[in-house]
């Protein structure tokens, strides 16, 4: 046993990379970045956390509630400096799945919204160098799992099929 962590969070969740993980409070505003043996960073955000993703290189993506947009996705460097943020519109949706490419240069984001009273799921790829999201798909099925097959290919597993995007 390397460590034992007592978060005290009401709705704890975890996202892991190769050498660190983030433990966060869903619907709360606190997160902790941990290595195998110690706390690296603790952060209290202004808004409630929806979802986090950790890359293999320690880059952290945090999707939060926002007063100015539907959701705010903030990407932090391994030293917890803000690298970029994306204020997601009502048309783009609220993130429900996120996954970093193995090289940590891009982030796949599945988001949900409603259009004409119907559920709509949107899939985006966000380049961390440019910060501009590119929409890969839009449909009525929400990905149950999202990941990268390589640095250029995203796999989305839906309820009744799996789709590869290049």
Language model segments and positions:
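Short beta-strand elements that form the blades of beta-propeller/WD-repeat-like
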Residues: 1, 14-26, 31-32, 52, ...
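A short beta-strand motif characteristic of beta-propeller blades
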Residues: 2-6, 37-44, 82-88, 131-138
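Short acidic/polar, Gly/Pro-enriched loop/turn segments located at secondary-structure boundaries
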Residues: 8-11, 26, 34-40, 47-48
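A structural detector for beta-sheet-dominated domains
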Residues: 34, 46, 55, 63-64, ...
């Amino acid at each position: 046993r390397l460590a034992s962590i007592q978060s005290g969070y009401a709705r704890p969740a975890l996202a892991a990379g190769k050498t660190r993980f983030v433990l966060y409070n869903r619907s709360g505003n606190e997160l902790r970045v941990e290595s195998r043996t110690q706390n690296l960073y603790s952060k209290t955000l202004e808004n409630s956390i929806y979802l986090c993703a950790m890359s293999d290189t320690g880059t952290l993506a945090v999707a939060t509630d926002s007063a100015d947009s539907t959701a705010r996705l903030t990407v932090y460097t391994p030293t917890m400096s803000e690298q970029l943020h994306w204020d997601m519109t009502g048309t783009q949706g609220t993130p429900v799945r996120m996954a970093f490419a193995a090289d940590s240069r891009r982030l796949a984001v599945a988001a949900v919204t409603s259009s004409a009273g119907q559920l709509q799921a949107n899939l985006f790829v966000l380049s961390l160098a440019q910060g501009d999201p590119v929409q890969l798909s839009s449909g009525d099925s929400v990905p149950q799992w999202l990941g990268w097959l390589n640095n250029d290919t995203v796999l989305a597993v839906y309820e009744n099929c799996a789709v590869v995007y290049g």
